[in-house]
Swiss-Prot record:
It holds the Pfam family DUF4878. It comes from Aquifex aeolicus (strain VF5). This is Uncharacterized protein aq_142.
């Protein structure tokens, strides 16, 4: 009986260890998922918190602002743009995530709009401390197998 208890405890401990390790990039997937959820809900202000600060600033400075918006901070304009983009999103699906190294992952996301058009994006996500940030978003172009 004692051996059975020890075996059961060993199996449970092994499962807990494996579960705690999990995917090394699961935080990256969660960050991208939460970012896309905020955009889909029209919450651009909350979405920009998931962007790496240097990338957020780079995106914000690329906007050409009409005169009526010059009083707004660039990050506020970016938040408005992200909120507007979310109005047309129907479905978001994380297709895959690949660890590049312990602090970088690539996450591929499929976005379907309300007209049924599918687009794929690649998110480069970096870990700083214990938090993941989106450092780059690009159109995803699948590579054809050899």
């Amino acid at each position: 009986m004692r051996n059975k208890v020890l075996i059961v405890l060993a199996v449970i401990a092994g499962a807990l260890i494996l579960k705690s390790c999990g995917e090394p990039y699961s935080g990256a997937k969660e960050t991208v998922g939460e970012f896309m959820e905020e955009i889909a809900e029209g919450e651009g202000r909350d979405a920009i918190k998931y962007l790496y600060p240097a990338y957020r600033d780079e995106l914000a400075k690329n906007f050409k602002l009409p005169v009526q918006f010059t009083e707004m901070k660039p990050s506020e304009v970016l938040a408005c743009v992200l909120s507007t983009m979310g109005r047309n999103i129907d479905e978001v699906e994380i297709k895959k995530a690949i660890a590049v190294n312990p602090n970088t992952a690539n996450v591929v996301v499929k976005v379907e709009d309300k007209e049924g058009i599918e687009k794929f994006f690649s998110f480069t996500v970096v870990k700083e401390g214990d938090k993941w940030y989106i450092a780059k978003i690009e159109k995803y172009i699948p590579q054809v197998g050899r």
